């Protein structure tokens, strides 16, 4: 009799633990309707200090949703890493500005994504801020008042 009660108790505790652990890490229902992390074509504005105009180029970037879990119950001293859609493989292309004045190096390089994946943000190579500048934004388009 005690063996059966202990089996039932263990099964109830296991069920309680598994049920609770799934509710600790909740996923928003809308997350499954967002586009996944993938390559997309994007127009990007290139600019170079000393050159008068921006130039638009077509490139591939990583964009989309990565499934991320945020714990409802916060555990002290534990790290929660949010995953972002970022480059897996990339190469750099070179562009030469046609209208730079003499003495200004007209060459600039920009990344072209070859593949993407969900990973922690590497701030050295990616902009993982919540609201960053749009890829086709150009500083030269902002009027300066002196």
From Swiss-Prot:
Highest rank taxon of the organism: Eukaryota
InterPro entries: Cystine-knot_cytokine (IPR029034), Glyco_hormone_CN (IPR006208), Gonadotropin_bsu (IPR001545), Gonadotropin_bsu_CS (IPR018245)
Residues with glycosylation annotation: 41
Subcellular location per the Swiss-Prot or TrEMBL entry: Secreted
One GO-annotated biological process of the protein: ovulation
Position of the signal peptide: 1-22
Main location (coarse class): secreted
Protein keywords: Disulfide bond, Glycoprotein, Hormone, Secreted, Signal
A Pfam family of this chain: Cys_knot
Alphabetized GO MF terms: hormone activity
Cellular component per GO, a single term: cytoplasm
Disulfide bonds: 37-85, 51-100, 54-138, 62-116, 66-118, 121-128
Described function: Involved in gametogenesis and steroidogenesis.
Family: Belongs to the glycoprotein hormones subunit beta family.
Subunit structure: Heterodimer of an alpha and a beta chain.
UniProt-recorded name of the protein: Gonadotropin subunit beta-2
């Amino acid at each position: 009799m005690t063996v059966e009660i202990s089996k039932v108790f263990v099964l109830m505790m296991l069920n309680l633990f598994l049920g609770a652990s799934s509710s600790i890490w909740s996923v928003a229902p809308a997350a499954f309707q967002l586009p996944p992390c993938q390559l997309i074509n994007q127009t990007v504005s290139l600019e170079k200090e000393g050159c008068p105009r921006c130039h638009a180029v077509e490139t591939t970037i990583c964009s989309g949703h990565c499934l991320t879990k945020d714990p409802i119950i916060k555990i002290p001293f534990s790290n929660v890493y949010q995953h972002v859609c970022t480059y897996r493989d990339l190469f750099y292309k070179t562009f030469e500005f046609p209208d730079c004045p003499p003495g200004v190096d007209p060459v600039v390089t920009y990344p072209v994504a070859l593949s993407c994946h969900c990973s922690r943000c590497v701030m050295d190579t990616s902009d993982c801020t919540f609201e960053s500048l749009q890829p086709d934004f150009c500083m030269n388009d902002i009027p300066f008042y002196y």
